[in-house]
Amino acid sequence: IAQQDGDYYNVMPCIYERGNIAMVKIIGRHSIKRGEDRSSMMGDILLYESDTGILRALMDGEYITTLRTGISAAHSARLFTRPDFETVGLIGLGNIMTVCIRAFIASLRAEGDRRDVTLKLIRYHGHQQRIMDLFREDPNVHFVLCDTYEEVIGGSDLVISAITKVTENFVTDEYFKEGCTVIPICTMGFQNCDLFFDRVFTDEMEQIRGFKYFDHFAPVTTNVTDVLNGAAPGRTDNVQRILVYNYGIAIHDLVFAANIYGRAAVPDTPYRYSREKYFI
């Protein structure tokens, strides 16, 4: 649901009948007004018993969305980035990016991969320091601080953006090196890539069908699920430029919400829904 000045709501229903769970999430981005103390992204999740419609929980949708979105992006980065990557450009250094890059580096180290990784960070209100602090104990993570998007993206093997509001492309085509992977978590700022990248991967075709250049890149688009199931190839060489619109779908929210709810060791709040057929 689009609003003025780039604000919006996303309404995301989902049902998993085998688990007897249904969910509706509403999450939106709204510019912060003067004097407000909140995140620009806020959301809530309603969790239901799917066979009765009884509400089981009202949950913080922002926290769950941040976790699953960042982890989905990190998974995409591991899946589609060229194996010999060295340099990662990061734009939008907020909560989602924090989850994403922590998960990305942690997954490398968990597999015994101690390679040197250079993170190129855009300078913005000191946010770069938060990312640098995450890896102060890892001597193989290095940093380059950049003042322009051209510096961040140019020469990077992997580019991840988590900016939630942008009105134009970050850079022109020549800054995307051969073999790079681009993951625009919030889908913004890389519309020019739709026109010349070699491969596009997505978690849900319907989510991107309304994109301006969908008809142009649809023939080279593959569902990530098909790659994971072995039904389609992922990256096939080190020269393909790959664009990934894989940032999580409602079923991921449901899985996170159901698992958190199942582990909640707190008393239930009474829910006084009507138990009478006639209540008027």
Where are these regions (language model features)?
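Glycine-rich adenosine-cofactor-binding loop
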Residues: A73, D84-S107, I122-H127
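NAD(P)-binding Rossmann-fold cofactor-contacting core
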Residues: S107-F135
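Rossmann-like adenosine-cofactor binding region
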Residues: V141-D215
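Short helix-loop-beta connector
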Residues: F80-T87, K177-E178
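N-terminal ligand-binding/catalytic initiation module
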Residues: I1-T66, A74, D84, T222, ...
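Adenosine-phosphate binding glycine-rich loop
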Residues: C193-I280
